[in-house]
Regions:
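Bacterial Sec-dependent N-terminal signal peptides
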Residues: 1-27
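Short, solvent-exposed loop/turn segments at conserved positions within beta-propeller repeat blades
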Residues: 176-183
Length: 231
């Protein structure tokens, strides 16, 4: 029996206990998870009657009151980068209809060196703009509002001393059959530990590409990019 902590980004840090053996694909052993327990929030303010820990004051500190999906990757040492998708500022209200509030950003970036997750994930810092608010890293709807809806990170990885994040640039969320449409997908890179980012325009995937969304993996000195279509 082992215990591990995982993150459900934008919502809670969870603790999992159980038989967590994972073998090769042709093995009969599988990953088994039980006893899932919510520990803390990662971003945002507590809800009325909320008893979860909330170690990060992301609302007043960074104007991050609500976030979309999140992803994390190992940078160096104990340092982890965390990209969040669509992010709302002051005035955000939790509801089933999506984002609201002020200061919409398509994505924001946080950093953590916390290795003890039993009391929640603590954010050390976020990438900030001149006003001290979490900065939109990958250009979203505000740069081309007639065409761009938003730019959502799908996966990130460090290669040598370069950090890379794959994004999908959304054209329409309301396509038929629950799908969404992209203008393109691309990669942004940073060579200064996440302080500045630039888009690699030569790495661009078309709207019908099977690399509209990806997951990165490392093995034997190679980096693999596993892709799928948008929506």
């Amino acid at each position: 029996m082992r215990t591990k902590q995982i993150l459900l980004f934008g919502l809670v840090t969870c603790s999992l206990t159980g038989n967590m053996a994972c073998k090769d694909a042709d093995s009969e052993k599988t990953l088994c998870i039980d006893n899932v327990r919510m520990i803390s929030r990662v971003t945002g303010d507590p809800l009325p009657g909320d008893t979860l820990l909330n170690p990060n004051n992301t609302g007043p500190d960074f104007d991050v009151y609500g976030t979309d999906l999140g992803l994390m990757w190992h940078m160096d040492g104990n340092r982890v980068g965390m990209f969040f998708g669509d992010t709302s500022g002051e005035g955000f209200v939790v509801n089933k209809n999506g984002g609201n509030g002020s200061n919409w950003r398509s994505n924001v970036l946080a950093f953590s060196s916390d290795t003890e997750l039993t009391d929640g994930l603590k954010i050390d810092s976020m990438l900030l703009d001149a006003d001290g608010k979490a900065l939109e890293v990958c250009a979203g709807g505000k740069t081309n509002p007639e065409v761009y809806q938003t730019s959502i990170p799908t996966s990130a990885i460090r290669a040598g001393k370069t950090d890379c994040v794959h994004i999908m640039n959304i054209y329409d969320w309301g396509a038929p059959h629950g799908r969404w449409l992209t203008n393109f997908s691309s990669v942004y890179t940073s060579n200064d530990d996440g302080r500045t980012w630039e888009r690699l325009e030569e790495v661009t995937f078309s709207p019908d590409s099977h690399f509209s969304q990806v997951a990165y993996a490392k093995r034997d000195g190679w980096i693999y990019m596993l892709g799928t279509q948008a929506g």
